[in-house]
Amino acid sequence: MEHQSLFSFSNPEFWVLAALVIFFGLLVVLKVLPGALFGALDGYAAKIKAELDEAQQLREEAQALLADVKAQREDAERQAAAMLEAAKADAKRLAEEAKEKLEEQIKRRAEMAERKIAQAEAQAAADVKAAAVDLAAQAAETVLAARLAGAKGDTLVDAAIGQMGAKLQ
C-alpha cells in the first residue's frame, strides 16, 4: 500500500478539501454564510436575552410579592396582638366592673339588713317599754286601789291613771 501525500493532485481527499475551501470562500465572498450564521446566532442570542429579561422581571415581581406578603403577615400579626391586648383589657375591665357591682350590692344588702335589725331592735324596745308601762300602770292601780278604798279613792286612782298614761306615751 502506497502512501500518498495529502497535497497531491491525485489524492481525492485533496480535491474534497479544495472544493470545501472554495465553497466556504464563495459563501463568505457572497456574504451568505456570515449573514445567515450571524443572523441565526443573533436571533438565538436575542431570544436568550428576552428569556433572561423575562426571568429577571418575574424574579423582581416574585420578590415584590414576597415582600408584600411578609408585610401583610406582619401587619396581621400586629393587628392580632392589638386585638389580644384589647380583649385582655376588656376582660380585666369587665372583671373589675363586676367586682365593683358585687361589692356595691353586698354593701347595699348589708345596709338594708342593718336597717331591718335597727327597726326590729327599736320595735322590740318599744314593745318592752309599752309592756313595762302597762305592767307598771296595773301595779300602780292595784296598789292605789288597795290603799284608797272608797269613793274618794276611786276618783284619785282614775285621775292618776289618766295622768300616768298621758306622761308615758
From Swiss-Prot:
Keyword Cell membrane on entry: yes
Entry GO CC: plasma membrane; proton-transporting ATP synthase complex
Disulfide bridge partners, by residue number: none
Topology in the lipid bilayer: Single-pass membrane protein
Gene Ontology MF terms: proton-transporting ATP synthase activity, rotational mechanism; proton-transporting ATPase activity, rotational mechanism
InterPro entries cross-referenced by the UniProt entry: ATP_synth_b/b'su_bac/chlpt (IPR002146), ATP_synthase_B_chain (IPR050059)
Parts of the chain that traverse the membrane: 14-34
Highest taxon in the source lineage: Bacteria
Any Pfam family hit: ATP-synt_B
Organism: Caulobacter vibrioides (strain ATCC 19089 / CIP 103742 / CB 15) (Caulobacter crescentus)
NCBIfam families reported for this sequence: PRK14475.1
Keywords: ATP synthesis, Cell inner membrane, Cell membrane, CF(0), Hydrogen ion transport, Ion transport, Membrane, Transmembrane, Transmembrane helix, Transport
Protein name: ATP synthase subunit b
Family: Belongs to the ATPase B chain family.
Cell compartments where the protein resides: Cell inner membrane
Subunit organization: F-type ATPases have 2 components, F(1) - the catalytic core - and F(0) - the membrane proton channel. F(1) has five subunits: alpha(3), beta(3), gamma(1), delta(1), epsilon(1). F(0) has three main subunits: a(1), b(2) and c(10-14). The alpha and beta chains form an alternating ring which encloses part of the gamma chain. F(1) is attached to F(0) by a central stalk formed by the gamma and epsilon chains, while a peripheral stalk is formed by the delta and b chains.
Function of the protein: F(1)F(0) ATP synthase produces ATP from ADP in the presence of a proton or sodium gradient. F-type ATPases consist of two structural domains, F(1) containing the extramembraneous catalytic core and F(0) containing the membrane proton channel, linked together by a central stalk and a peripheral stalk. During catalysis, ATP synthesis in the catalytic domain of F(1) is coupled via a rotary mechanism of the central stalk subunits to proton translocation.
